[in-house]
């Protein structure tokens, strides 16, 4: 990767879960909490919660990632209770367990990613481009990540969502560089890699287990399995 002068990071899935889709982390949390539903039932409640969060303002700007997770788990488990798949009486108890498990998992991933982010921060300007709920600044501050990023481009704030390439164009604009001089690091082929390449950016796809088998089957010359491989690719 030559002539890179700035870097755009995705957040969720890229920095906080080693490229693994967040549904998989939450599913692991369900196992820890001994929530006895099928994977199909879980995926249904996961989608329900995502749509509810998009439709109704539950997440406020001051909420950190634990706050977000607890709200999300209450919605997911509430849905399962409404479907008579779990007992309403256990919703709060189990929501607390899953939220804590997921928050701890995210913090561990963030700390693993920190040396790489730090190394890149020392060499390049960094911008974060994320589909998020309007609270990514609070999430970053809680994980002590905010200072690494020159600017944050968040979907809920700018009114553009991935995979619209315009959200990456805003990130490039924030770096005051040409797209060809920018490396985009993300975990989603459809939401990060394709739109970033559409506007001419270089890419690094941190590929973990995705949401669908179709995405898992996709290949690309710029796949990395760990975030720190970016350091090698950039020759740092």
Feature locations, PLM:
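N-terminal helical cap/lid subdomain that shapes the substrate entry/recognition surface
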Residues: 2-114
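Switch/coupling loops of ABC transporter nucleotide-binding domains
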Residues: 124
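Asp-based, Mg2+/Mn2+-dependent phosphohydrolase catalytic module
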Residues: 1-9, 40, 87-92, 114, ...
